[in-house]
């Protein structure tokens, strides 16, 4: 059964709650926010479903210690009863081999409402445009 917070959560709150979960670096905390057949398109590959996504996220968490991931300038382009899509700038910072590192780019997310809960259905993260 859903908590009161989950049933009243809208698409925007669901996205920010997902980002909070990402910053725990725990797949067990992230997974409840991700659809079973979610697609993640990252620079290195495309990952479909929980098992593939878990492996990709855990590889990143090992590579970037203490990573903090954030979204900026979120624009919701389509919001319907059970689907919402947005684009944004993402940023990350952390330690790679003990050295401070950071980066970012542009992203698109599609959330789908499943059994009353907004879940990540699709996430595409890519570089900033070449100037």
What is the predicted function of each stretch?
Residues 4-5:
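Boundary at the C-terminal end of the N-terminal hydrophobic targeting segment
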Residues 87-94:
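Generic short beta-strand segments
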Residues 70, 101, 105:
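Exposed loop/turn and edge beta-strand positions of beta-sandwich/beta-sheet ligand-binding modules
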Residues 12-14, 27-82, 88:
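A solvent-exposed, acidic/Ser-Thr-rich amphipathic alpha-helical stretch
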Residues 96-98:
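Outer-membrane beta-barrel domain signature
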Residues 104-131:
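Short beta-strand edge/turn micro-motifs at domain boundaries
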């Amino acid at each position: 059964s859903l908590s009161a917070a989950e049933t009243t959560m809208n698409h925007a709150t669901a996205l920010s709650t997902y980002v909070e979960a990402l910053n725990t670096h725990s797949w067990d905390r992230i997974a409840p926010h991700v659809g079973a057949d979610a697609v993640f398109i990252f620079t290195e590959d495309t990952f479909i479903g929980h098992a593939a996504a878990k492996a990709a996220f855990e590889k990143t968490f090992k590579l970037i210690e203490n990573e903090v991931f954030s979204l900026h300038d979120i624009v919701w382009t389509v919001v319907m009863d059970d689907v919402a899509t947005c684009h944004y700038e993402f940023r990350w910072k952390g330690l790679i081999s003990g050295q401070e590192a950071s980066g970012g780019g542009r992203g698109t997310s599609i959330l789908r409402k499943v059994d009353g809960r907004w879940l990540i259905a699709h996430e595409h993260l890519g570089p900033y445009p070449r100037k």
